[in-house]
Amino acid sequence: MKVGIDMGTTSNGDNVPLDIEELLATRLLVQGNSGSGKSHLLRRLLEQSAPWVQQCIIDPEGDFVTLADKFGHVVIDGERTEAELIGIANRIRQHRVSCVLSLEGLDIELQMRNAGIFLNAMFDADREFWYPVLVVVDEAQMFAPSVAGDVSEEARKVSLGAMTNLMCRGRKRGLAGVIATQRLAKLAKNVAAEASNFLMGRTFLDIDMARAAD
């Protein structure tokens, strides 16, 4: 049975459906400047697909923790040790629980490091637990930066490696990547290039428009 998500309407008033089965078999990139509706679109996608598929959201700003109230997502405090994050990620895959990894309030280096550890543990789960999971990463340019920033090389390596695994090899392990960014030019090319579907919103900067054209 096919399940379609109603993503909105066209200028003619026709519904715009998104096939969940197709989404789980591919990778999606959502791009648009601040205020273009990315968070609204992601929220719509998550709320409408929640009854049908397990979800894991990497949430740097705390925008998605309220999914717990209506849909029962487990909210995970991102300020944990490496061993704790790995253990939780393993249980999430084993028990097929939808979750939100809340990184709000952590500095950027700790956000990158802990998100990377969590995603890598999801990726490294035993084969018997490779059930389909919709993995949504908001502000993806933070976790897969195109250039080195002010964070340690260790944090950048862990985070970028996890994002690369998700987008390049995750599908075979049941992980369907959905990444959202407001600065496409700041997102690592090898991560963005793996997306097979694109939803493009309002974009102002020439450098981002040039990347989108690529």
Language model region names:
Residues 29-36, 46, 116-214:
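Conserved P-loop NTPase motor cores
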Residues 16-20, 29, 43-121:
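Switch/coupling segment of Walker-type NTPase motor domains
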Residues 39:
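Walker A/P-loop
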Residues 1-17:
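N-terminal pre-Walker A segment at the start of P-loop NTPase domains
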Residues 2, 13, 59, 138, ...:
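Residue-level signal for pocket-adjacent positions within structured domains
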Residues 24-25:
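Pre-Walker A (P-loop) beta-loop-beta motif of ABC nucleotide-binding domains
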